[in-house]
């Protein structure tokens, strides 16, 4: 696997797109999931300069919890790191991943309670391509959910290289 984010297509009995699992990074503040995701992403994609949560929070964060306002900060993050973003309902995620995951990890901020939570998607698998694997900075774990679960937790913001 190269450091530029090239995905590996699974063949044989496996179906889907698998990227190198990113390092597990735990968020350091209540709302700094976005910064932990970008730090993790920068460690596996040489197209993004190495980042730390602390620097990202200092530069882009808002307030003591380290959160951001997506409507203003997502475009700023995209500009700073050469990313592209989209906002859509959850049902579009599967198609988006099929189109872009082979070329880039995908930052995904979905609705969790009354706030948004960011994760870094690195795999789309299963016979129907409905299993989404991601690095979750809430505890710093690798987890998975179905595309249906993401659909139920939309709308969402996604970013890719």
Region roles according to the model:
Residues 2-64:
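Active-site nucleophile-adjacent alpha helix/oxyanion-hole segment immediately C-terminal to the catalytic cysteine
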Residues 4, 44, 54-161:
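Conserved active-site-adjacent core of cysteine acyl-enzyme catalytic domains
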